[in-house]
């Protein structure tokens, strides 16, 4: 596949914006095996339950499910294996310092292909309380009602 300048989003973590107030985002590279990248390019990846932890000064993506490649036979990968994220040392240090505070975690927001490489947009998020989620739902419903009213007004 030729390298292009465009990026194609393959997986979105919609649950992350509902459960966490995202304060900062960073783009990280993904270390994948041959059958993993083929499955990712087909869009067979799920990051709904995924999270990032640090082990020995490295950022590792846990619980990301990449489906088996159909033609991979015995060389297929393990679906739920931990995958290394490629970040600069300074980025890892700042993220480790941020996560050490109470209530903060790092979650993947998007998986996409950029210039032929698999990338992961990770976000530093603070967990939302139940009332925060309800407030967000109320705002979302109000915005939807306003948009609907404006759309109906433009029709007539």
UniProtKB/Swiss-Prot annotation:
Region (Disordered): 130-156
Molecular-function annotations in GO: RNA binding
Gene Ontology BP terms: trans-translation
UniProt xrefs under InterPro entries: SmpB, SsrA-bd_prot, SsrA-bd_prot_CS
Species whose genome carries this gene: Exiguobacterium sibiricum (strain DSM 17290 / CCUG 55495 / CIP 109462 / JCM 13490 / 255-15)
Disulfide bond entries: none
Bias type Basic and acidic residues, positions: 132-156
Gene3D superfamilies, A to Z: 2.40.280.10
Name of the featured protein: SsrA-binding protein
Domain of life: Bacteria
Functional note: Required for rescue of stalled ribosomes mediated by trans-translation. Binds to transfer-messenger RNA (tmRNA), required for stable association of tmRNA with ribosomes. tmRNA and SmpB together mimic tRNA shape, replacing the anticodon stem-loop with SmpB. tmRNA is encoded by the ssrA gene; the 2 termini fold to resemble tRNA(Ala) and it encodes a 'tag peptide', a short internal open reading frame. During trans-translation Ala-aminoacylated tmRNA acts like a tRNA, entering the A-site of stalled ribosomes, displacing the stalled mRNA.
Coiled coil region boundaries: none
Pfam families: SmpB (PF01668)
Keywords: Cytoplasm, RNA-binding
Location(s) in or outside the cell: Cytoplasm
């Amino acid at each position: 596949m030729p390298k292009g300048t465009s990026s194609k989003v393959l997986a979105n973590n919609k649950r992350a914006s509902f459960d966490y107030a995202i304060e900062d985002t960073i783009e990280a590279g993904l270390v994948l095996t041959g059958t993993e990248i083929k499955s990712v390019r087909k869009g067979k990846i799920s990051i709904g339950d995924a999270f990032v932890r640090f082990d020995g000064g490295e950022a590792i993506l846990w619980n990301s499910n990449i489906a088996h490649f159909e033609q991979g036979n015995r060389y297929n990968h393990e679906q739920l294996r931990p995958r290394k994220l490629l970040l600069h040392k300074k980025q890892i240090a700042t993220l480790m310092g941020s996560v050490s505070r109470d209530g903060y975690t790092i979650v993947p927001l998007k998986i996409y292909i950029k210039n032929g490489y698999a990338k992961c947009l990770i976000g530093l998020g603070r967990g939302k309380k139940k009332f925060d989620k309800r407030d967000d739902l109320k705002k979302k419903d109000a915005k939807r009602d306003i948009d609907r009213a404006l759309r109906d007004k433009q029709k007539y």
